[in-house]
């Protein structure tokens, strides 16, 4: 109860200013003005990349038909234009692209697909680790072990991103949630692209068909989750995995990737509990092998992909924590990227150093990551010329940094900081 009362006191003392409120405008004109004033740079090529994936997916998807796809495209365009919905859909655009591309995989003609690798993963497993770890862990089964594997793999795995999004919104610095959304989306998008270019059979295929060559006519299998269906008298996992758009997507393991990325973000916000978060990663890795869905080498690939995406986001965009602050409403300014230490950042804020560009800003200190110096050009220009948590200025401001920190934020800033993302 003491922790809860302390949290309530902190929340009551917070300056919950207008910059943390939802944008409620339905007028699309501010979005068009933002686009018109955007300082375009090579970093905006990411949207060309996303558009290319969406166009490819729309070409190959057979259901829904043309008008269905046209209607969805129009709704998405409206959602990205109207400020009320833009603050949600803009940070999620990468996740939406990944989901549509993942769904489109079931419609890709077989003549466009590369051959399926059946022997590569078990061979690598034996070469690197001296044995097939997945086979060893799945030999002994028991209903209790099935439940222990099902809870994180079949339940927590799918709910964790939403729970973590809520936690990051409340307890992380403003701007962390959109960084999490984009990092999560890009990790999954790259993972699916690798699975499309390098299709590999999972352990359940070896158990069912041996090392015989595979074809795309083979349907997916729930593996060990079939025992969960039998235990509860359902067919949820059997039906779900049998109709999966990506049957031969063993490498990299996005189950391991999700768990690792979740652990990295939570460890960033709650470093004291990082061992618990990484313990969950190990637990889920055991589940994937016990349920015959992945080889250990798949898990390594998925975790490496998550680490690469997180490090990139951390260096360039992830807001820094500040000592003594727990809730997002306690932050008066935010520094993006980790080119500077927390001590140096706090010192810059106290002294009003010109290297600190306002309430929420990048630092142009020479010791920062070199690439960070041009990140202001990546962001959409704020036509009101106001600073807010999650925004950048379209032109250098003459006032000192200390004055900028004390200025009230723009009332048009979203709680998701969506309109100012690169």
UniProtKB/Swiss-Prot annotation:
Residues 109-159, 205-245 are lumenal. The chain crosses the membrane at residues 48-68, 69-85, 88-108, 160-180, 184-204, 246-266, 275-292, 293-313. Residues 1-47, 86-87, 181-183, 267-274, 314-422 are cytoplasmic. The modification Phosphoserine is found at residue 353. Belongs to the AUR1 family. It comes from the Eukaryota. This is Inositol phosphorylceramide synthase catalytic subunit aur1. The keyword Ribosomal protein does not apply. Catalytic component of the inositol phosphorylceramide synthase which catalyzes the addition of a phosphorylinositol group onto ceramide to form inositol phosphorylceramide, an essential step in sphingolipid biosynthesis. Gene3D superfamilies: Phosphatidic acid phosphatase type 2/haloperoxidase. Its EC number is 2.-.-.-. Residues 386-406 are annotated as: Disordered. One of its GO terms (cellular component) is inositol phosphoceramide synthase complex. Component of the inositol phosphorylceramide synthase complex composed of at least aur1 and kei1.
């Amino acid at each position: 109860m003491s922790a809860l009362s302390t949290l309530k006191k902190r929340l009551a003392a917070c300056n919950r200013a207008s910059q943390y409120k939802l944008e409620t405008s339905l007028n699309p004109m501010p979005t068009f003005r933002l686009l018109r004033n955007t300082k375009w740079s090579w970093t905006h090529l990411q949207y060309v990349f996303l558009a290319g994936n969406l166009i490819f997916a729309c070409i190959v998807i057979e259901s829904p038909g043309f008008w269905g796809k046209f209607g969805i495209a129009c709704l998405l365009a409206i959602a990205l234009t109207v400020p009320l919905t833009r603050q949600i859909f803009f940070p999620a655009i990468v996740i939406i692209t990944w989901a549509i591309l993942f769904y489109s995989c079931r419609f890709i003609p077989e003549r466009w697909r590369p051959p399926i690798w059946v022997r590569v993963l078990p061979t690598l497993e034996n070469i690197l680790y001296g044995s097939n770890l997945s086979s060893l862990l799945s030999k002994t089964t028991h209903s209790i072990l099935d439940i222990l594997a099902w809870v994180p793999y079949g339940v927590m795995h799918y709910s964790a991103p939403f729970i973590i999004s809520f936690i990051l919104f409340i307890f992380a610095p403003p701007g962390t949630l959109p960084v999490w959304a984009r990092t999560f989306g890009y990790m999954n998008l790259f993972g699916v692209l690798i699975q499309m270019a390098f299709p590999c059979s999972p352990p359940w295929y070896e158990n069912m068909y041996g090392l015989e060559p595979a074809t795309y006519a083979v349907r997916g299998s729930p593996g060990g989750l079939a025992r969960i269906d039998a235990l509860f008298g359902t067919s949820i996992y059997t039906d779900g995995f049998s109709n999966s758009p990506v049957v031969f997507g063993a490498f990299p393991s996005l189950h391991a990737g999700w768990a690792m990325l979740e652990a990295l973000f939570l460890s960033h916000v709650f470093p004291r509990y990082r061992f618990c978060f990484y313990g969950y990663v190990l637990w889920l890795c055991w589940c994937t092998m016990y349920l015959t869905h992945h080889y250990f080498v798949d898990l390594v690939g998925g975790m490496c992909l998550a680490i690469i995406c997180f490090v990139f986001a951390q260096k360039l965009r992830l807001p820094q924590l500040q000592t003594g602050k727990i809730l997002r409403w306690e932050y008066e300014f935010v520094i993006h990227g980790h080119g500077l230490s927390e001590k140096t950042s706090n010192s810059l804020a106290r002294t009003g150093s010109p290297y600190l560009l306002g309430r929420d800003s990048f630092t142009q200190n020479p010791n920062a990551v070199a690439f960070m110096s041009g990140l202001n050009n990546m962001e959409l220009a704020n036509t009101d010329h106001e600073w807010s948590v999650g925004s950048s200025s379209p032109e250098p401001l003459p006032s000192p940094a200390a004055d900028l920190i004390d200025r009230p934020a723009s009332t048009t800033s979203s709680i998701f900081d969506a309109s100012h993302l690169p």
